[in-house]
Amino acid sequence: MTKYVVNNSTIDSILGWIKAGEIAIPEIQRPFVWDSSRVRDLMDSLYKGYPIGYIITWKNPDTKLKDGTVSLGKKIVIDGQQRITAMTAALLGEEVIDSDYKKKRIKISFNPKEERFEVLNPAIEKDTEWIDDISKLFKHGFNMFGFVNEYCALNGIEDTN
């Protein structure tokens, strides 16, 4: 009898689990300890298609979670909490609880011309070549066509249809 199964899952699948509340962090996991530059580096690795390591989950119906509830059959994160939390922060725009137990919003920016990620700062915020917060690209109802047209207009890029 198999004790475990290895699945290859896409980032889209993992984000779907997070949005649907199907994945949870157990009470025993530590707070989020990555700094913003490490989150930026993870986004860069994902963009370039580099492997980011395993994320190990376990289905257990009665594991106590960080929010005080019980897992009720959700996927419990055993290894990969920092990476999942980083993706949740950068791609879904959710706040994280840092090592001082304070809520913090991490905004990662992207420059399509240079294909480069950075942590949002005041200079980037004013520069139209940068997408100031990549999480807006993943919001429900996001209008990609309108966004691309606006980006091109702001940056003097002609429509190449």
Give the role of each language-model region.
Residues 2-161:
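Basic- and aromatic-enriched surface patches that contact anionic nucleotides/nucleic acids
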